[in-house]
Amino acid sequence: QAGKLVLMRADGEITNTHFRPMRKPMGMAVKSDRLTVGTAFGISDLRNTPAAAGTLEPHGKHDALFLPRAEYYTGDIDIHEMAWQNNELFFVNTRFSCLCKLNPDYSFDPVWRPAFISAYDPRDRCHLNGLALRDGKIRYVSALSQTDTPGGWRQHNSDGGVVIDLQNNQIVADK
């Protein structure tokens, strides 16, 4: 389902789904009672409201209800992946080829970019697209290529790809 966040829950022997319209949902992060989603132009922060979940029909079937509590405008930066590290939200800013953290005072706050990226540029130079945590800290990011030209990754779509260790800024896997 394009343009929808799909929420699922067990309902006896079946899986029940609920579709919530969102504009281009991609990256998602979960932290205790929070569900945070990167969308076409921002970040939506939803919070679990258990007391309200009990009022949903049919009664007794819902143990969580995530309601929108905050929206942050980022612009069209193509958020591909997100994660909570302690109390800070980090996300992959694919258009600017960098890792960012949420800062309510700015559209985004860049904290790291690959060594092969020479400047912040909204033209997607390497298609930075994934991240992974280790021991609760962001440790790895992935990109489709090591290119530093606007859209240069497209020429390596099927034969590129790297994983970078943020601890030492080294490529630990490539295709």
Where are these regions (language model features)?
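Sequence-structural signature of mature extracellular/luminal beta-sheet repeat domains
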Residues: 1-175
